[in-house]
UniProtKB/Swiss-Prot annotation:
Transmembrane intervals: none
Alphabetical list of InterPro entries matching this protein: CwlT-like_lysozyme, Lysozyme-like_dom_sf
BP GO annotations: carbohydrate catabolic process
Cellular component per GO, a single term: cell surface
Gene coding for it: pvaA
One Pfam assignment: Lysozyme_like
Localization per Swiss-Prot or TrEMBL: Cell surface
Name of the protein described by the UniProt record: Pneumococcal vaccine antigen A
Length: 204
């Protein structure tokens, strides 16, 4: 009886893993449809941003499933949901990322600080420049709790549950109105996911 239950559980785990892999593969395929557009817009701009990073950010933001694929409305207008077409979203997103990358270079901080600043805002780059010059989860969490959240009304440190393969090892929560302090790590993970799936698709 126990062996049968164990087999069922193992089968269930394999089926779930297979389903998740299929969903991730579909999401990667969706994001990769924007590759020509990303490449074209990058060629128009003087930017240190690269194609792989931008695609990973699209995957992180929307998986390519919304009009504002890079969720760049707020950086353009100060309000959300004001950009509805993909090209404008990507163009604005790349402009914002470019500004962050140049500022990060000027301040002598790492590239992942610039990526995290896409979620937190460019002031995060100054914060990291004054605190070791390298983006860490501890510093991102501190900035979320002490700067972003209070600025947007959460002065009590209130949190909410946030389940993600990265967050489950670090408390599985975020601060209300505090942005996403896992953002740069999610982008990095998604960068590898896209590379792996595209490599697999090419070799297949």
């Amino acid at each position: 009886m126990f062996k049968r239950i164990r087999r069922v559980l193992v089968l269930a785990v394999f089926l779930f893993a297979g389903y998740k892999a299929y969903r991730v593969h579909q999401d990667v395929k969706q994001v990769m449809t924007y590759q020509p557009m990303v490449r074209e817009i990058l060629s128009e701009q003087d930017t240190p941003a690269n194609e792989e990073l931008v695609l990973a950010m699209i995957y992180t933001e929307t998986k390519g499933k919304e009009g504002d694929v890079m969720q760049s409305s707020e950086s353009a207008s100060g309000s959300t949901n004001t950009i509805n077409d993909n090209a404008s979203s990507i163009r604005q997103g790349i402009q914002t990322l470019t500004g962050n990358l140049y500022l990060a270079q000027k301040k002598g901080v790492d590239i992942w600080t610039a990526v995290q600043a896409y979620n937190f805002g460019p002031a995060y780059i100054d914060f990291i420049a004054q605190n070791g010059k390298e983006n860490t989860l501890a510093l991102a969490k501190q900035y979320s709790r002490e700067t972003v959240a209070p600025l947007l009304g959460n002065r009590t440190g209130k949190t909410y549950s946030y389940i993600h393969p990265i967050s489950i090892f670090h408390g599985a929560e975020l601060y209300v109105n505090g942005g996403n302090y896992y953002y740069s790590r999610q982008v990095r993970l998604n960068l590898y996911i896209i590379k792996c799936f595209t490599l697999f698709s090419t070799s297949g």
